[in-house]
Amino acid sequence: MSKKAVPPIVKAQYELYNRKLNRAIKVSGSQKKLDASFVGFSESSNPETGKPHADMSMSAKVKRVNTWLKNFDREYWENQFASKPIPRPAKQVLKGSSSKSQQRDEGEVVFTRKDSQKSVRTVSYWVCTPEKSMKPLKYKEDENVVEVTFNDLAAQKAGDKLVSILLEINVVGGAVDDKGRVAVLEKDAAVTVDYLLGSPYEAINLVSGLNKINFRSMTDVVDSIPSLLNERKVCVFQNDDSSSFYIRKWANFLQEVSAVLPVGTGKSSTIVLT
């Protein structure tokens, strides 16, 4: 009976853990040479008490080695795995909108009166590619991670603001439950399983059927897709070669359109059509 092959994602997780473990052991040895009283890292037991760790699961071992590297090899941790702070720009307000206005449902058109005759309305619209059907996600030979680009999603007019990006991935077939991941990597990171699993940003597990992953900025709107992603890149990892991935990309924009409001005074009301 042939030995069951180890899934690529499990293999990559062990390789990443072993890389961290080897680093912790190496640094521990170097520190002990400088200070004999230094308490180094131990995978199997608590070095301070000498007692075996109660939890030897992979998640517990990863948590322990991560904590140790953060405390005793901070520079290495920050260079390899730490999350960089995300800038938080001031909240943007669309032209003609009021800072006191409340958040409204998607697709609603809001009229904001600037004076007695002129106003601007903001219209929400979506663009997608491909338009008619989803397309297969293609990987290079002997690779199972690919970067997804969004430069084919264009606004109708220059100056339209971007609200969000939606990535649809339909997973068909496959022999294992763990289908793959969607993760955000730094701009200069290599597009590999190792970097994807070690990304400091949240990774989304994919399941059979249709998966929808939304990407939004910390501000209400941004000027471009690179601004929304903070110059980072989106990558998809396919864990099971027997499954097929099909994708479609969407972008939600806001467009300002000139409008004319009735002149005069009196009671003003709004009806929102949903």
Swiss-Prot record:
Q: Which Pfam families match?
A: RBDV_coat
Instruction: Name one cellular component (GO) term.
Output: viral capsid
Q: Does the keyword Coiled coil apply?
A: no
Per UniProt, subcellular location reads as: Virion
Which InterPro entries does UniProt cross-reference here? RBDV_coat
Principal subcellular localization: virion
Q: Region Disordered: what ranges? A: 88-112
| Compositionally skewed regions (Basic and acidic residues) per UniProt | 102-112
Query: Which keywords annotate this record?
Result: Capsid protein, Virion
- Name of the molecule in the record: Coat protein
